């Protein structure tokens, strides 16, 4: 969430939203007795604990988070922020993405990207409160817990904030890299995209279209149209984003035209220039976007995988790409 605020100040187009701060997380853990319960569970785990023990500890702690209600005062503050967001978005119950953001998650060295949860399509104040609480609990996923145990990191030194951001109505979305994620080439921007929301892309559930653009002259070097069989769409009845079969008319249709490719490229190169290092970015082309408008950026992180510039095997490997980029996602009804 801090990166989105920074990008907004740098005049990058980002969705509206608000943050539930680290202070709010600490306050909830102290007031609800979670601090004591967490310490009790973790104190019984050695640094080399097996995954069965780690998963059991994770389940116990996450269940404790679900059982502890947010205090009336804190819940009122979060509810007020959500209601203000609804006013700004001109929507009675604006659908949101509720995203975890822990200390160190965006560090290129720590490579924490993807270790915590995101809940998509969350609308209504009570559902937002439930999703915030679940995001807090995701600090203790088995993967996150095992990582901290191996590296001697205390959960007290790695508190979690939560971003509640407007869920942009996506025509198309995906990921983009300011360095080739497979070959390591720094002379191009690599774009992967599909129809709808980007979860099917980052989870490796769909083979996305693939584009490469030269940084020197913004020339489109290649565009491969993939056969896309799954789409992430908003289920209004369930109140969440779900994966469904791609409509037949879109399976083999090119996702981005040249103008849209150029808009994504422009955003990615601007973000790389702002930070001064290679980045990977989540982008969304809104249904309401007009030609010439910027695309919306919903996440930007340092590239966490360093690879040599050498020829790579041909073909798209969704599992490999998801491993490089994916972040945990769950629908929250």
What are these regions (language model features)?
Residues 1-161, 172, 252-267, 272-276, ...:
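N-terminal beta-alpha lobe that positions the nucleotide/phosphoryl donor
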Residues 104, 170, 197, 304-306:
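Short loop/turn segments at secondary-structure transitions that flank enzyme active sites
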Residues 314-318:
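Flexible linker/loop signature enriched in Pro/Ser/Thr and Pro/Gly
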Residues 99, 110, 119-121, 130-132, ...:
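Beta-strand scaffold of nucleotide-dependent catalytic cores
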Residues 45-49, 53-57, 176-191, 240:
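Short N-terminal secondary-structure initiator segments
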Residues 161-172, 178-180, 240-248, 252:
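Amphipathic, soluble alpha/beta structural segments
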Residues 188, 192-280, 285-286, 319-333:
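Conserved catalytic alpha/beta cores of large enzymes that bind or transform nucleotide phosphates
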Residues 199-203, 306-312:
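Cytochrome P450 core scaffold surrounding the K-helix E-X-X-R motif
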């Amino acid at each position: 969430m801090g990166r989105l605020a920074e990008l907004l100040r740098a005049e990058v187009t980002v969705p509206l939203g608000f943050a539930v701060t680290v202070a709010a997380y600490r306050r909830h853990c102290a007031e609800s007795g979670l601090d004591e319960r967490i310490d009790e569970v973790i104190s019984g785990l050695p640094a080399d604990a097996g995954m069965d023990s780690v998963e059991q500890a994770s389940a116990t702690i996450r269940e404790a988070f679900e059982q502890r209600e947010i205090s009336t005062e804190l819940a009122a503050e979060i509810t007020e922020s959500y209601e203000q967001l609804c006013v700004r978005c001109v929507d009675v119950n604006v659908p949101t993405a509720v995203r975890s953001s822990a200390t160190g998650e965006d560090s290129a060295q720590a490579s924490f990207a993807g270790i915590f949860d995101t809940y998509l399509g969350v609308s209504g104040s009570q559902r937002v409160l439930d999703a915030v609480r679940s995001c807090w609990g995701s600090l203790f996923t088995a993967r996150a817990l095992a990582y901290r145990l191996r590296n001697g990191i205390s959960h007290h030194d790695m508190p979690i904030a939560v971003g509640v951001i407007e869920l942009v109505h996506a025509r198309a979305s995906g990921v983009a890299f300011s360095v080739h994620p497979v070959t390591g080439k720094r002379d191009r921007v690599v774009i992967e995209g599909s129809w709808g929301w980007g979860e099917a892309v980052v989870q490796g559930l769909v083979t996305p279209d693939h584009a490469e653009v030269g940084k020197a002259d913004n020339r489109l070097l290649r565009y491969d149209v993939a056969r896309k069989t799954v789409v992430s769409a908003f289920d209004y009845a369930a109140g969440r984003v779900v994966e469904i079969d791609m409509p037949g008319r879109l399976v083999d249709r090119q996702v981005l035209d040249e103008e849209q490719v150029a808009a994504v490229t422009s955003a990615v190169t601007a973000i790389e220039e702002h930070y001064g290092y290679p980045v990977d970015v989540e982008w969304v082309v809104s249904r309401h976007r007009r030609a010439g408008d910027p695309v919306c950026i919903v996440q930007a992180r340092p590239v966490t995988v360093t690879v040599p510039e050498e020829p790579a095997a041909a073909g798209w490997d969704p599992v490999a790409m998801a491993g490089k980029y994916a972040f945990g996602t769950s629908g929250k009804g």
